[in-house]
């Protein structure tokens, strides 16, 4: 259900509030362009600056707008176990198809603390849980052994978004679990290398603006057609890189605005607009790929 190309959706704002119609348009855009699933309220969706009410509203609106035409994965992780459980229960209640659970950030739990955190969430909910390992943001790395333990102990822990930048993690995780475990790349630049050794797809930033291409690359990789998939990977390599020229989601939201996919380039502080020099670099790559004029 969650194989292939999953978009880490940007959150459109307008006049300081959630742009409901903008969100609806983005969801339709991804349905029309072959995206396999949508993550809302993740890192790319600016979840840290959403109010609790906005977080719930975003999930509920996405579920309603999708109307079961595309799976919705709700970002409901937190560094408070109680808060993560509460938000995950809400996502389950309103009909989200899965939950993305980030490793607790800032408070830097031990591996046993990470296990106990996700154990509590898994025991309190029934929704499929995709764990999210991104040590560059959280300050702690969930080791493959910890994930494997959770995967083996709780049937609703179905997979992991692996954003360590380490392709070997795929093989390590498979060796501790099985070939069918859901591993999703958390880095567009590493999607194809990770799929070559057993990952099942990507939770993608670039998919916000090139959904057809990312979807096709993942489809080819899942079919074992790596030579064809490699052509797409290499063609968009410069785009994958420039989208991280500043902190995500600043460049991708700027690109979406320049392409007319969102009406307002609103970022919430402490995120701030791109520097002029970096924006020009972004525009240059977008023009090269005929995404803007």
UniProtKB/Swiss-Prot annotation:
Principal cellular location given in the protein's record: cytoplasm
Reaction(s) this enzyme catalyzes, per UniProt: L-aspartate 4-semialdehyde + pyruvate = (2S,4S)-4-hydroxy-2,3,4,5-tetrahydrodipicolinate + H2O + H(+)
GO CC annotations, alphabetized: cytosol
EC supergroup of this enzyme: lyase
GO annotation (BP), single: lysine biosynthetic process via diaminopimelate
Coiled coil location: none
Oligomer status and interactors: Homotetramer; dimer of dimers.
Annotated protein name in UniProt: 4-hydroxy-tetrahydrodipicolinate synthase
Gene that encodes the chain: dapA
């Amino acid at each position: 259900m969650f194989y292939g190309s999953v978009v880490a959706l940007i959150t459109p704002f307008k006049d300081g509030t959630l742009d409901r119609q903008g969100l609806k348009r983005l969801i339709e855009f991804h349905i029309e362009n072959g995206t396999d699933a949508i993550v809302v309220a993740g890192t790319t969706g600016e979840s840290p600056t959403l109010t609790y009410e906005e977080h719930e509203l975003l999930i509920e609106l996405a579920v309603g707008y999708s109307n079961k035409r595309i799976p919705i994965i709700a970002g409901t992780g937190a560094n408070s176990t109680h808060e993560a459980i509460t938000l995950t229960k809400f996502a389950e209640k309103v009909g989200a198809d899965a939950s993305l659970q980030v490793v607790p950030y800032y408070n830097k739990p031990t591996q046993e603390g990470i296990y106990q955190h996700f154990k509590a969430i898994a025991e309190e909910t029934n929704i499929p849980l995709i764990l999210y390992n991104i040590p560059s943001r959280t300050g702690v790395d969930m080791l493959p052994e910890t994930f494997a333990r959770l995967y083996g102990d709780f049937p609703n822990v179905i997979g992991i978004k692996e954003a360590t930048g380490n392709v070997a993690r795929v093989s390590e995780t498979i060796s501790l679990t099985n070939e069918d475990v859901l591993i999703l790349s958390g880095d567009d630049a590493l999607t194809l290398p990770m799929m070559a050794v057993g990952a099942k797809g990507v939770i993608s930033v670039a998919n916000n603006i090139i959904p057809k291409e990312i979807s096709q690359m993942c489809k080819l990789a899942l079919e074992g057609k790596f030579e064809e998939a490699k052509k797409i990977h290499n063609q968009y390599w410069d785009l994958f890189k420039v989208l991280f020229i500043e902190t995500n989601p600043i460049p991708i939201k700027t690109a979406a605005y320049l392409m007319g996919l969102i009406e307002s380039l609103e970022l919430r502080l402490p995120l701030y607009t791109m520097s002029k020099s970096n924006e020009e670099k972004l525009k240059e790559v977008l023009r090269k790929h005929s995404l803007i004029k």
